[in-house]
Amino acid sequence: MGSIIESCAKAADKVRDICPLVHCITNYVTVNDVANCILAIGASPIMADDIAEAADITSISKALVINMGTLNARTVESMVAAGKKANELGVPVVFDPVGAGASNFRNETAKRILENVKISILRGNLSEMSYLAGLEVSTKGVDTSEADETVSYTHLRAHETGRNL
């Protein structure tokens, strides 16, 4: 366990030492929290979701975060352009497909991003991940269904007890 903690501490120190610029195309509900969290770990956030600058900002960034929380047609173009630029430059891309499975627009956007951008980290709740895996889901946005919570709890308990499902 000590080696994991030491590795995390070294990684955190490195982030503080280099203060990387993190380009976020994120939702307006959490934009302030996202910026403050990035600042708290020693990085520097920039929120740029206009197509006129998305690729340019990505080209000077050390990471790109794409979040579909407050999705609109304008930002989809920026997400894809920034993602392609990040891939071209070897910049890691974090993708949060918020609400995937909830609407055709979100489903098509998630599919488009996954087809056009190499994702480094894919994050989301169980409903979103299940939808992306092609499973039947009842997505309600950022919330998971009761069945999803049951499955999540079951997997957690299995992990805690050392059992495989």
Kindly label every feature range from the protein language model:
Residues 155-158, 162-165:
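Single conserved hydrophobic/aromatic residue that forms the stacking wall/gate
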Residues 55-157:
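Glycine-rich phosphate/dinucleotide-binding loop and adjoining beta-alpha-beta core of small-molecule
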Residues 2-95:
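Conserved N-terminal subdomain of the carbohydrate kinase-like
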Residues 33, 131-132, 164:
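Phosphate- and divalent-cation-binding pockets in alpha/beta enzyme and binding domains
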